């Protein structure tokens, strides 16, 4: 009898769906960023990448000379051979990257009420800097693209998940702590490569294995 009573506890009546409280709407309490991009920003970028994925197999026309790309790849002493597909892939990737960055810069120009992008104008650097700052995937260009102080210090950075990073975070150096939270990057120190370290380590390993 005791066992039956214990088993009956697992079959308690469950509340119906009408009695359950509605789930909390978290998105209503989240503040919108003050520097939000224009409304057609996301659909336009999404349509662009959909079209690019559809034309990814079209490798007959190249925007960059393949011979120069191959020459740059061979300038690396660690590269011994370059396949025929590698320059084609890099050329297509560079073309897509430049078009994406140009579109983001132009959308920032439209947001500011301007309709021209001139190379000699100082606003060009501001537009490109804003495009690289507002997109998390372009943070690797932080050391290449001239940074606009107004964009870097005043505007926080959007995380891919929609979170806003602290204003003190330096663009181009994403740093995570043990909890996955962004933190201020430490001072980066470049250590010069010492020639012969790899050979000496290999010799020590070979000597120890030979002695055994």
Curated annotation (Swiss-Prot):
Transport recorded as keyword: no
Signal peptide: none
Main location (coarse class): nucleus
Keywords: Activator, DNA-binding, Nucleus, Transcription, Transcription regulation
Entry GO terms, CC: nucleus
GO MF entry, a single one: protein heterodimerization activity
Keyword DNA-binding set for record: yes
Places the protein is found: Nucleus
Bias (Polar residues): 1-10
SUPFAM superfamilies: Histone-fold (SSF47113)
Pfam family membership, one: CBFD_NFYB_HMF
InterPro entries: CBFA_NFYB_domain, Histone-fold, Transcr_DNA_Rep_Reg
Subunit-structure text: Heterotrimeric transcription factor composed of three components, NF-YA, NF-YB and NF-YC. NF-YB and NF-YC must interact and dimerize for NF-YA association and DNA binding.
Family of this protein: Belongs to the NFYC/HAP5 subunit family.
Name of the protein in its database record: Nuclear transcription factor Y subunit C-7
Organism for this UniProt entry: Arabidopsis thaliana
Gene expressing this chain: NFYC7
């Amino acid at each position: 009898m005791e066992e039956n009573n214990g088993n009956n506890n697992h079959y308690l009546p469950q509340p119906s769906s009408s009695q359950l409280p509605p789930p909390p709407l978290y998105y209503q309490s989240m503040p919108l960023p003050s520097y939000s991009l224009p409304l057609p920003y996301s659909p336009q970028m999404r349509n662009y990448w959909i079209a690019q994925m559809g034309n990814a197999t079209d490798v007959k026309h190249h925007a960059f000379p393949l011979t120069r790309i191959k020459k740059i790849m061979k300038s690396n002493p660690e590269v011994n051979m370059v396949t025929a597909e590698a320059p084609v892939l890099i050329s297509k990737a560079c073309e897509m990257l430049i078009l994406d960055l140009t579109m983001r810069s132009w959308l920032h120009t439209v947001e500011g009420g301007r309709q021209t992008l001139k190379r000699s104008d100082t606003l060009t650097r501001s537009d490109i800097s804003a495009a690289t700052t507002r997109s998390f995937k372009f943070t690797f260009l932080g050391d290449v693209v001239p940074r606009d102080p107004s964009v870097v210090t005043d505007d926080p950075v959007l995380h891919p998940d929609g979170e806003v990073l602290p204003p003190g975070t330096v663009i181009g150096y994403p740093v995570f702590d043990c909890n996955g939270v962004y933190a201020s990057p430490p001072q980066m120190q470049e250590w010069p490569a010492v020639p012969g370290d790899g050979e000496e380590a290999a010799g020590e390993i070979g000597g120890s294995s030979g002695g055994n």
